[in-house]
Amino acid sequence: MADYQFQRVIRFGDTDAAGVVYFAQLLSICHEAYEAAIAALGIELRSFFSDRGSVILPIVHAEIDYQRPTYCGDRLEIELQATALGRDRFRVDYRLSHNHQPVATAQTIHLCLESQTRQRSPLPERLQDWLQITAD
């Protein structure tokens, strides 16, 4: 599996007063795709995203470039690919499209920290496996 595929219909609450998707909402939708990819590994999201786990994975960088507007009712296709950036961080690249037309590209960089000490920590084995799968 080179890329993880995710689909999301744009809802009215995703849009602004002009009727297009609010700019920051596309990053939120990218995070939904990331969560779905993690869940597809069989990782339980509640513990994965809480301080009760052994590590946390905060986003330390995010960027997005928009190619065209999207509207309520549009079905977005989101492809994501994750890449290791050393032993304690990784990047997720997102390609968003509607009807096979590019909508946006985005990127997030995540850093692995021990949840209690907030010190850098190696990526957990299951996450390393995911990075390997999406890199193939």
Swiss-Prot record:
The keyword Endoplasmic reticulum does not apply. Its EC number is 3.1.2.28. Pfam families: 4HBT_2 (PF13279). The keyword Hydrolase applies. Transmembrane segments: none annotated. GO terms for biological process: phylloquinone biosynthetic process. InterPro entries: 4-hydroxybenzoyl-CoA_TE, DHNA_CoA_hydrolase, HotDog_dom_sf. The active site is at D16. It catalyses: 1,4-dihydroxy-2-naphthoyl-CoA + H2O = 1,4-dihydroxy-2-naphthoate + CoA + H(+). Keywords: Hydrolase. One of its GO terms (molecular function) is fatty acyl-CoA hydrolase activity. Pathway: Cofactor biosynthesis; phylloquinone biosynthesis; Quinol/quinone metabolism; 1,4-dihydroxy-2-naphthoate biosynthesis; 1,4-dihydroxy-2-naphthoate from chorismate: step 7/7. It is an enzyme of class 3 (hydrolase). Catalyzes the hydrolysis of 1,4-dihydroxy-2-naphthoyl-CoA (DHNA-CoA) to 1,4-dihydroxy-2-naphthoate (DHNA), a reaction involved in phylloquinone (vitamin K1) biosynthesis. Belongs to the 4-hydroxybenzoyl-CoA thioesterase family. DHNA-CoA hydrolase subfamily. PANTHER family: 4-HYDROXYBENZOYL-COA THIOESTERASE FAMILY MEMBER, ACYL-COA THIOESTER HYDROLASE YBGC. This is 1,4-dihydroxy-2-naphthoyl-CoA hydrolase. It comes from Synechococcus elongatus (strain ATCC 33912 / PCC 7942 / FACHB-805) (Anacystis nidulans R2).
